[in-house]
């Protein structure tokens, strides 16, 4: 076998090949032609359909991807106060280090943007996707939904509220889950929300893939809002994100008003019940 140490192979500590990153993100690299000719995929090492790649910056690893919707989603989730992975537009000078200007311009001319977010895992903390946790529960005769409602109810219900507001039709078992302590294998709470490049759907009856029950995002959110302290006023007062059109923004505001009303109704009913008990 090879005589290698973790220090030598850890991707958290060692440089990444820029040519591979360029190919994964843009599908082309000036210095990677021999391998490019055999590759027919937009990404090489990470899940999902969007073109993406890991790029090392001065303060750590960043995921670069094509998807301007992430910017709008970040702004809305900021206003809602829901924990999430923050996306920013990628710096031009860093893109120019791995790809030629023509291919970067082609993406921008299509109306898209290249965005980035900092890695959320580390050598000390891993992420466990929900679908992997479900497999574990199936082998140990445990109800995964009972576990998550006890382990991290606020983030679980906030996710359902956020997905309805964003019209996110692509929340699934591979893009949400738990943090895990690598020292002892114990699960922590849910990691921040991410992966919103399929948000802002115009469909009204999007099925929820995070609920225990067969229901829509709307139905799941109406139930969930009573268990969260999500604030809707900041979204209702904020300016429309430049990445969204008027129609998409109107739907966001309509859903916020709807859930705010439901939240007030639940709070009123709880106050009435407490008064009656006294």
Show where each model-derived region lies.
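Phosphate/dinucleotide-binding and metal-coordinating scaffold of catalytic cores
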Residues: 1-168, 177-278
